[in-house]
Every structure is written in structure tokens, then in C-alpha cells.
Amino acid sequence: MKERKVGLALGGGSARGLAHIGVLKVLEKEGIPINMITGTSVGAVIGALYAQGKDASVIEDLALHLTQKRLFSLMDLTLPRTGFIRGEKIKGLLEMVIGGNAKFSDLRIPFACVATDIMTGEEIVINQGLVLDGVRASISLPGILTLATWGNRHLVDGGLVDPVPVDVLKEMGADFIIAVNVIPDIRARIHITDKDKTGKIKEPNIIGIIMQSIYIATYSLARTSLEGADIAIQPQVAHIGPTNFWEARECIELGEVAAKASIPEIKRKLEA
């Protein structure tokens, strides 16, 4: 296998993003080197953990402990000035697994996460300072989780501008890019998950409306990003609800299935 600078872009997608763990398990097993990582939203969380040197099985164990009861306990609701959920409990959980003092410069694998400046619409690439702060900004779903502050900027989820951060990897020097997208075709998602027993499309609640709006806006962006990757892995997770983190095991398995199917092409292209 030729020496290449292999970059891995892990996209956003809420609970569906747990499929990234399955992809990492397969890449590890097959000996595919990862020289740099970028992540958006849930991809930023998993990417940060992997960049710290935690192997996929350790990250998998963390994900499998996300029970429905545990998740509900993290919902510190607040008056919705910038979001329904204050996010301090979520940040506390992230601090437990990432560490409150871990810096980007401490990471074993170069890593960057992306967020969106809600005032200017700019993509903000975060690759310095505290990893915890960068990840917290990247996961801040607008209207749901309160804004994150980064210097004098107010940041929200990076998926609004770069749901699968392929171009950031190119800027970091990657010359072979594996991108993982878990944002499904919106028509497939509605067909599979949003109908009642009579076949009628359900009316979404306020959180569902916000998330649906984000998915509509980001699906086309994700497809465009994938065009810049050498390999695009797309786990079939449309039937997994975006907040169903307790379905981690199935998400991870679906990530493995998708990654295994891509291994022959990855090896062929790396050896070319």
C-alpha cells in the first residue's frame, strides 16, 4: 500500500452518526491508516474521541451506554431564548469522555471540527484550543441546543454549512479522502419513519420541524461534499430516528456493513 495522507470526514446526522463507529471498527480491522480527521456535529464527537487515541471498541462501549433514560436525564430544559436545552449536562458528559483540559495540540491524530457562525453564516473550522469547546460548538443544533460562544462569535451546528467536511481535509493536506455520510435522502426518510399505522404522514412536533428543516437544507450540501471524496461510505440508517441514540447497536452494525462493502475499493485505490 502506497504512502498516502488519508483523511476521514465524519458527517453530522444525530443518532444516525453512531454508524461512524462501525466504519471505524472496519477500517481498524482492515489496517486502513487514518492520518487526519474532520467532523461535524456527532461526527465531531466521534472524531475527537478517535483522534485522542481511543480505539473504536472503546467508543462503541461509550455509545452502548446511551440508554433512553440516560439521554432524557441530559435534557436540562431552559426558556427558549437561543435553544430549548441549556446543554450544560451534555457538556458535562462530553467532559467525562473527552476531558475538560484536552487541547487540539494534544491529539494523536490531527483533527478539526466545524461549526457555523449564526450571525454571518460563515463556516468556522476549529482546530485549536480546548477540544471540548470545539465539539460543543459543532453539536449545537440551532433552536434546540443553546448557542456556543467562541471568542466573539456565536456558533451553532456545523452541519448548516458543511455537513460532511471534505474540503477541510484537503486544506489539512489529505490526498486520499474517505467520507462518511449518514444524512439519508429526505424522501426515503419520510417513507420509512414518518407514517402512522394507516399510512398517513405524521404531523411533526416543534423539535421535529427544526430537525427536518436542517435535514432538507443539508442533504444537498452533503451530496456535493461527497463529490470531493475518493470514497463515500453511506450507511443505510434512514429508518433510525435522529434522536434515537439508544439504537446505537444497530447503527454501529449498519456502519460496519457499509464500510465492509467499501473496503475492496479503498484498498484498490490506495494501491493504485
Task: Cite the ranges covered by each PLM segment.
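Patatin-like phospholipase
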Residues: 1-40, 48-272
